[in-house]
Every structure is written in C-alpha cells, then in structure tokens.
Amino acid sequence: VVLIILDDVRWDSLGAAGNATVRTPRIDELAREGIRFEQARVTTAICMVSRATLLTGQYMSRHGITEFGRAIAPEPFAHTYPALLRRAGYWTGYVGKYGIGRPRPDDFDVLRAYEGAHWMDGSSGERIHVTEKNARDAIEFLQARPKGKPFALTVGFFAPHAEDNAPEQYLPQDWSARLYEGVTIPPPLRGDPDYLAALPPFLSNE
C-alpha cells in the first residue's frame, strides 16, 4: 500500500483530469494503470483536519483535530490505518509532511517526517527541494523494506504548496522547470481585477 498526499492541489490540476497545461506524467501513469475516483470529496478542506481524517477514517467532529500542532493521541492513533496494518504484520512508513502535531517515532517502523521547509540539504550536501527529498526517502523505504513482508507507506509531499515567505511563491526545481519550457501558463480565471473588485474587501484583500 502506498498513499501519496499532495498539499494544496486542486482536483483539476492534473493531466489525468484533463488539464492541458499542468504536467503530471507520473500521476497520469498511476491514473491510467489504476483506478481513478472522480466523485471523491474531502470532508473538511483544511490541511491538518484532512490529514487526520485520512489517517483515522473519521470526521473532524469525531477525531477532534481542529488546529495546527495538535497531534492524534496514542489511544485513537491505535485505530488509524497505519497502526491497524502494522498490527496485522505490515511494515509501515511515513515520509514527508505530517501536519498533525509532532509524529511519534514509535508509531511507524520508518519515520522521516519534516515540517516547515521547502529547500533542504541532500545527503551529499547539495541543496534540493523537499519534494525531491520526499521521493528519495520513499524510494529508500521501498528498497530497504523486509522482503516478503507486506508494507504500507504514506508519502506526504509538500508540493504544490507555496513557499509562503518567499518573494516568488512557487520555486521550481530544475527538472520540473524543464517540463514547462516553451509553455505559456494562462492566468487564473478568477485573477481578473474586475472579479476581485466585485468581492467584499475581506475576500479581495486575502
């Protein structure tokens, strides 16, 4: 089992969903070779709430994660899918953005969670985007897992979340920038000044 979580991506921001501008070749391949659910909905469109719901299978009113920094307590975590699969004999791992307080190392066989960074130092000292680190850690988990044992890996990619404090909100990696060479990115449909002017100030200023 491999669960991939993307941060702040719209349902139609994938090539597999018919987007002619966005380049998502690997996700498109997964969609072609697997099953694509076209009627799925999130129960609460807030980062940590959705992550807690994915782990627990519960609504926010049940799991109680309503703010950043609040973790799932040990007793309810025992009923999450990683904990249930681990007790059933799966080798479990979590890499990337966790987003629900501080993860406890004992909750997974392999834990490489990191928060609040978009560019990091790689193992050989080079500066890499955290997306690349996510991918490397996931591949290492898959290569090092015990052979003949079922596994469950959750990969929490930061991308395409903006780097909130950066002058340029989206800073591409070299390889991803090459995907868009010669491509004109259309402006957002709701980026028109007339559209923004028609909104109440508390919305148009956000």
Question: PLM features: residue spans?
Answer:
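Solvent-exposed loop/turn segments at secondary-structure junctions
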Residues: 8-11, 36, 43-46, 60-61, ...
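Active-site-proximal N-terminal segment of extracellular/periplasmic enzymes that hydrolyze or transfer
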Residues: 1-44, 69, 86, 161
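Structural recognition of the beta-strand scaffold that forms the well-ordered cores
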Residues: 2-5, 36-41, 47-48, 53-55, ...
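Catalytic-site neighborhoods of secreted/periplasmic enzymes
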Residues: 53-141, 145-146, 165-176
